[in-house]
Swiss-Prot record:
Transmembrane segments: 28-53, 61-82, 104-123, 143-161, 200-222, 240-263, 276-295
Species of the source: Rattus norvegicus
InterPro entries membership: GPCR_Rhodpsn, GPCR_Rhodpsn_7TM, Olfact_rcpt, Olfact_rcpt_6C-like
Family assignment from sequence similarity: Belongs to the G-protein coupled receptor 1 family.
Intervals, Extracellular compartment: 1-27, 83-103, 162-199, 264-275
Membrane-side (Cytoplasmic) residue stretches: 54-60, 124-142, 223-239, 296-311
SUPFAM superfamilies, sorted: Family A G protein-coupled receptor-like
Taxonomic path: Eukaryota, Metazoa, Chordata, Craniata, Vertebrata
Annotated keywords: Cell membrane, Disulfide bond, G-protein coupled receptor, Glycoprotein, Membrane, Olfaction, Receptor, Sensory transduction, Transducer, Transmembrane, Transmembrane helix
Topology of this chain in the membrane: Multi-pass membrane protein
GO-annotated molecular function: G protein-coupled receptor activity; olfactory receptor activity
Principal localisation: membrane
Glycosylated residues (UniProt): 8
Name of the protein in its database record: Olfactory receptor 287
Length: 311
């Protein structure tokens, strides 16, 4: 499908998500894999939210932030994966302009929110391990609520400016988006107008969000590691590290895939690579989080055991 003249995003007309072209057997395999992973993501994160709500021992700031992260993962994957699954069906990749813009806004807003939430969770672990006697007085329920709310507000505000700029772009020629959801980079490639401002603003916001959240996380864990090393007993060190190991694992996976995603030569020559790596952030990481927090967290495992036994 092609258009011979440039059209503004407000002009009616669909885009087509290319998804994952290839042999039918491969597409069926990917469809089933993504479907199973999506269902596991929803069920796993709902289970964590339910566990925290059902057990008073888990109703602390740490698990309040975890519930926010679990809710975010459900929303994040739901904003992306159902349409991705639709691209495997004939004409399933067709998406309206409004639908594409809406999906892009929510996917990237939720992505920014995750960076902020992970930074807040790192700060919470810093207080719990480095300042245990003052933790209860500092990390009050009110502060935890404000930090979580601030993460959501900052995440959804950060993408507003680039989304507005993208909405003003004109497109000509092909409207086939070489991705499995409405990403910014493929839209920039399709535009027939100057995209320098959009690229600069998008890069600036991504740089500030990633660098800011990463900075808070790194500083927090620098203090945490220093404090753990100073603990004289091996048992004490293990106990202290176990309180943050789950979060650290999630942070390493999330930032690791982010680094791979942004280390690339050019937008045009790396769309296929970007599409493959983005699967880590949008599909793989959300399904891993519930299992990481369940398998590596003693309190969550105990709450799950009590729930299964009906106690």
């Amino acid at each position: 499908m092609a258009w011979s003249t440039g059209q503004n995003l407000s002009t009616p007309g669909p885009f087509i998500l290319l998804g994952f072209p290839g042999p039918r057997s491969m597409r069926i395999g990917l469809f089933l894999l993504f479907l199973v992973m999506y269902l596991l993501t929803v069920v796993g994160n709902l289970a964590i939210i339910s566990l925290v709500g059902a057990h008073r021992c888990l109703q602390t700031p740490m698990y309040f932030f975890l519930c926010n992260l679990s809710f975010l993962e459900i929303w994040f994957t739901t904003a992306c994966v159902p349409k991705t699954l639709a691209t495997f069906a004939p004409r399933g990749g067709v998406i309206s302009l409004a639908g594409c813009a809406t999906q892009m806004y929510f996917v990237f807003s939720l992505g920014c929110t995750e960076y902020f939430l992970l930074a807040v969770m790192a700060y919470d672990r810093y207080l719990a391990i480095c300042l245990p006697l003052r933790y209860g007085g500092i990390m009050t329920p009110g502060l935890a609520m404000r930090l979580a709310l601030g993460s959501w507000l900052c995440g959804f505000s950060a993408i507003t400016v680039p989304a507005t700029l993208i909405a003003r772009l004109s497109f000509c020629g092909s409207r086939v988006i070489n991705h499995f959801f409405c990403d910014i980079s493929p839209w920039i490639v399709l535009s027939c107008t100057d995209t320098q401002v959009v690229e600069l603003v998008s890069f600036g916001i991504a740089f500030c969000v990633i660098l800011g959240s990463c900075g808070i996380t790194l500083v927090s864990y620098a203090y945490i590691i220093t404090t753990i090393i100073k603990i004289p007993s091996a048992r004490g060190r293990h106990r202290a590290f176990s309180t943050c190991s789950s979060h650290l694992t999630v942070v390493l996976i999330w930032y690791g895939s982010t680094i791979f995603l942004h280390v690339r030569t050019s937008v045009e020559s790396s769309l296929d690579l970007t599409k493959a790596i983005t699967v880590l952030n949008t599909i793989v990481t959300p399904v891993l989080n519930p299992f990481i927090y369940t398998l590596r967290n003693k309190d969550v495992k105990e709450a799950l055991r009590r729930t299964v036994k009906g106690k």
